[in-house]
Amino acid sequence: MARVTVQEAADKIGNRFDLILTAARRARQLQLHVREPLVPEENDKPTVIALREIEKGLINGQIMDQLENNDAIQQEVAEQEAISFLADVQANA
């Protein structure tokens, strides 16, 4: 099990409060298997993995925003494609 110091992770983010928000968002992604870990799991829980990623500078608030924006765009494109497909099927029926 890797040792994580919250102070080092907070230094990467800027303050404890933003650290908590960023780590929670990332841990939720890991827990729901939305994204793969960027560091070896080593039997750690998602919160510890998130803190390790932050500590190594692999994740921060801006990166999380970009990832979530990309996911939202992909979701919107998929929905539009599904609507278009259903409209074509209905028109040809």
Swiss-Prot record:
GO CC terms: DNA-directed RNA polymerase complex
Coiled coil: none
Molecular function in Gene Ontology: DNA binding; DNA-directed RNA polymerase activity
Biological processes per GO annotation: DNA-templated transcription
InterPro entries: DNA-dir_RNA_pol_omega, Pol_omega/Rpo6/RPB6, RPB6/omega-like_sf
Gene3D superfamilies, sorted: 3.90.940.10
Catalyzed reaction equations: RNA(n) + a ribonucleoside 5'-triphosphate = RNA(n+1) + diphosphate
Origin superkingdom: Bacteria
Keywords associated with the record: DNA-directed RNA polymerase, Nucleotidyltransferase, Transcription, Transferase
The UniProt record lists the keyword Transcription: yes
Record-listed E.C. numbers: 2.7.7.6
Binding partners and assembly: The RNAP catalytic core consists of 2 alpha, 1 beta, 1 beta' and 1 omega subunit. When a sigma factor is associated with the core the holoenzyme is formed, which can initiate transcription.
Entry similarity comment: Belongs to the RNA polymerase subunit omega family.
NCBIfam families (alphabetical): rpoZ (TIGR00690)
Its biological purpose: Promotes RNA polymerase assembly. Latches the N- and C-terminal regions of the beta' subunit thereby facilitating its interaction with the beta and alpha subunits.
Name under which the protein is recorded: DNA-directed RNA polymerase subunit omega
Native source organism of the sequence: Actinobacillus pleuropneumoniae serotype 3 (strain JL03)
